[in-house]
Amino acid sequence: MSNKAWGGRFEVQPEEWVDDFNASITFDQTLIDQDIEGSIAHATMLANQGIISQQDSEQIIQGLKSIQHDYHQDQIQFSASLEDIHLNIEHELIKRIGDAGGKLHTGRSRNDQVATDMHLYTKKQVQDIIALIKSLQSVIVDIASNNVDTIMPGYTHLQRAQPISFAHHIMTYFWMLQRDQQRFEDSLKRIDINPLGAAALSGTTYPIDRHETTALLNFGSLYENSLDAVSDRDYIIETLHNISLTMVHLSRFAEEIIFWSTDEAKFITLSDAFSTGSSIMPQKKNPDMAELIRGKVGRTTGHLMSMLMTLKGLPLAYNKDMQEDKEGLFDAVHTIKGSLRIFEGMIQTMTINKERLNQTVKEDFSNATELADYLVTKNIPFRTAHEIVGKIVLECIQQGHYLLDVPLATYQQHHSSIDADIYDYLQPENCLKRRQSYGSTGQSSVIQQLDVAKQLLSQ
């Protein structure tokens, strides 16, 4: 007799190497808790509907709980010949409790069973990711709150552009992560749907109660169409997209951490606990954690592209191609959760070199726009002011000094309206004070921004 759940139809059994290719148990045992949770809800409902006896239901539930316990104690070894987590659990259940275990699959298919597992798993992981994003955001707010008055050069094209508050700069990533968090939150509406009871594709002739299993499994709603319930993995694609976009934001932040920690910048010093060294160069301290996060975005985006291509041409209902939805999602979830934890620890323990940052903006031309704006206050058209300042900057470069070093007489050679107050006007801290537009880098605006962020975190 075949040990396959579908063996009655077949005269020849697959060889072991074919079983290995077909099996998913090496990775889908990740779903054991979700599979057992779904099975307990199904067994409870079957008994309540009079489809199986209460005694059989109780035996099934106790058997499932014992399997779950023993699995987590490393006392169960699953078999590739049984293909997947569903059939391995069912086989073990029948071995433990006898014929009652064979009644569990009444009114259910592996098609709706695996869909239920994946919905439960994805929901839990998205909730975990949201919590990790919020935790990282909280650290960003703490760092920003302590650096409202720390000034640094802002960049465009990776060239110094205008002085900005370090707090304003780092809060940029708070808002990127806030949108990421919102995307995950919104996606829960499309993840938190119960497919259990859809069976293979057309529902079942048994008088099941899908509303009961929806409540037992704490789903927010249930699929209205049984074929849709088992056919799509759009919620996995959406989750992979949200993971990938969040990883893109972490990658951009990581790139800045890497640059800031260079000897050329020296804006920050990373903790030894989040750095590594070189096997040949004794002096090296490498930002490997940031580099790994920067690199892993390719991994998660690859999983997204893979899943899109897997679903692209599939006919409706279950196809074995859908087995490919798991490893990519599991790995992407593991990757982003690890990346968020590492990033939080990395920035929480880094040292911000405030003196270096404040000095840097006095050794560049990031206050050149301020000089142009100063001329505009003297009723000079901005385009004319831009031309004048460009010539002054060129002279400074040729002579090896900065705008604060230019003698007043030289300024007045370029335009007679420039007075001695220009030196206060060009001080970096005064450049920031004049930025009062909503969402700008001025102190009052940054403090207001932080207040909004703290309110969001408290919700």
Curated annotation (Swiss-Prot):
A GO biological-process term: L-arginine biosynthetic process
Xref: SUPFAM superfamilies: L-aspartase-like
Keywords associated with the record: Amino-acid biosynthesis, Arginine biosynthesis, Cytoplasm, Lyase
Enzyme Commission number: 4.3.2.1
Catalytic activity: 2-(N(omega)-L-arginino)succinate = fumarate + L-arginine
Pathway terms, separated by semicolons: Amino-acid biosynthesis; L-arginine biosynthesis; L-arginine from L-ornithine and carbamoyl phosphate: step 3/3
GO CC terms in record: cytosol
One MF term in the entry's GO annotations: argininosuccinate lyase activity
Subcellular location: Cytoplasm
Transmembrane segments: none
Any matching Pfam family: Lyase_1
Origin superkingdom: Bacteria
Disulfide links within the chain: none
Protein family per UniProt: Belongs to the lyase 1 family. Argininosuccinate lyase subfamily.
Protein name: Argininosuccinate lyase
Lineage, highest ranks first: Bacteria, Bacillati, Bacillota, Bacilli, Bacillales
